[in-house]
Amino acid sequence: MFDPKLKEALGRVQKPGRYTGGEPGSVYKDKEKVDVRFAFCFPDTYEVGMSFLGEKILYELLNRHENWWCERAFMPWLDMKAEMERLDLPLYTMESKDPLTAFDAVGFTLQYEISYTNILAMLDLAGIPFYSRDRDEHWPLIVAGGPCACNAEPIADFFDVVQLGEGENQLPSICAEIEKAKKEGGVSKKELLLRIAKIPGVYIPAFYDVTYCEDGRVKAITPNEPGIPARITKAIIKDLNEFAPPTNFVVPMVGAIQDRASIEVLRGCVRGCRFCQAGFLYRPMRQRDASLLNKAAQDLCANTGYEELSLSSLSTSDHGQLEELLDDLNEWAPKEHVSLSLPSLRVDNFSESLIEKTTKVRKSGLTFAAEAGTQRLRNVINKNVTWDEIEKTCTIAFNAGYTAVKLYFMMGLPTETMEDIEGIAETAQKVVDLYYSLPKRGKGKGVQVTISCACFVPKPHTPFEFVPMDTEEMLRAKQKHLLESVHSRKIKVNYHDSTTSFLEGVFAKGDRRLAPVIVEAYKRGCYFDGWEECFKYDTWMQTFADLGIDPAFYCQRAIGLDEVTPWSHMDYGVTHEYLVREYNKALAAQTTQPCNRACHGCGANHLLGGPCFDYSQNLV
């Protein structure tokens, strides 16, 4: 039965299915018979959160333990947030409808820097104090994980526990310590955190002090408790085959942004694109066996009823058994009317065989990431793709009947000039011209080439962490020049808002002094900052000014190669020396080959205790 207040709220909002729960695949347990209750919170709408594969992995993993119960919570949309505040209805989980304060731990996934005010909004709706220092052992532990944990410093003061790296071993270990402490009784919050701090990859922000230089740079980050490491090394799953993919998703009531079956075929990437934070955070690359993936995929589609299967990873076409896997999947998928999609295909290893094996049921859209408009700039960012490869790939696609292609680029890249911006338009025009030059193209059909252009944001743990981000004026000038450089109605241009990218850049490289800014901006009405209709840029800028913080200090200045950064105490495997070496190669427009062809000494092999690949085998 729903609480009367909840029933009233649901009757007054759009899409009440976002908040009702009861979806197929949901896990229900007797809360009186479980020892640990964990609330997995996604700081965005239900539709966005239900697209997140990481939540599905950890939800199934924790709920395999009979005496643990993992439930879900999402950020309510504007109308529901207002109703919950009006009715004094605390934020609750989808399964039990219990408030977040009833849980032992409340975990947030940090997927995007612009979601930080939504975290505060969810804590506020739950009646939970923002700052860790204001919560004793009677409050739930507030836990964070995900890619933005690689520099969680702007929000570190809000969290009791931050997980660096991969959570499959880490999160169950945290829950086990919570269970042990509850059974012992009388364990203080500090004692529990000291125990949790011993788990590989766990960062307890309260156990570190940060000092600053007179010019505002970080001076030092030092542990303040005995036995706490000076640097925290990320957690990693050495063998992905030891963790089978989830085979029974919660199927959403309201259509998710990506409403399909999804299975992670590999983790990490061998390519070494210098702009790509994920490529460095998840090193080294590890893949699952084709036989395991085929069985899991078949079970997943049977259990959920989905008719589209996505083979997910940073670079799916680099899986060493991809052709074998596709052959196995095509033994059963067409019979079950299940289509296959490979969302991360690369221009340089796209083939007729791949396109034939993934279009037996229906065609999905084709998106290729060229990233930069000229070969010089592609060399700078180590995007080892040439025009000849782009031409070959588009030829294969057009001959297979495709008439629409999306090309993904970035602007604001290091060393970029207006000639590189013109190169984006020229590349798109060459693709249009290529289509009309092919004799096999569909008669009477036109072509549509979409340019999708993101603003480059330098990120920690990459070779470009040292570079300043373009100013908003520079980015707007480049966007204008791109539009003026496109002369064909066959080409459509989309680009990102530079103001949200600026805020993303500030938090990506920010430090603990930003926490009060985030709190104050939230109090002034900033949340859902990633949504164009909700973003209050002027409010953010006024908040920075009122608190005496210059946001440009964080993202629009060069970082010294020997400078202590807010993330210097976080070890994701790749050494600082390697990042500097790659940065210098970028300035010289020199490329680095994929690391499955030759080891370049990035340092990530120490996470596995040996070589990342068997270089005696032909891995190319």
Regions found by a protein language model. Give the residues of each.
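Radical SAM enzyme core and accessory elements
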Residues: 1-27, 38-40, 487-620
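N-terminal [4Fe-4S]-dependent radical SAM core
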Residues: 7-39, 46-47, 205, 211, ...
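N-terminal pre-triad scaffold of radical SAM enzymes
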Residues: 38-44, 62, 250-277, 301, ...
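Conserved SAM/AdoMet-binding glycine-rich loop
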Residues: 40-41, 299-406, 411-450, 454, ...
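Canonical Radical SAM [4Fe-4S] cluster-binding loop centered on the CxxxCxxC motif
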Residues: 52, 255-291, 601-619
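A short beta-strand-loop structural module common to alpha/beta enzyme folds
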Residues: 67-79
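Glycine-rich beta-alpha loop elements in corrinoid/cobalamin-binding modules
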Residues: 76-223, 463-511, 519-533
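Flexible glycine/acidic-rich beta-alpha junction loops that bind and position SAM and/or redox cofactors
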Residues: 78-79, 154, 209-213, 320, ...
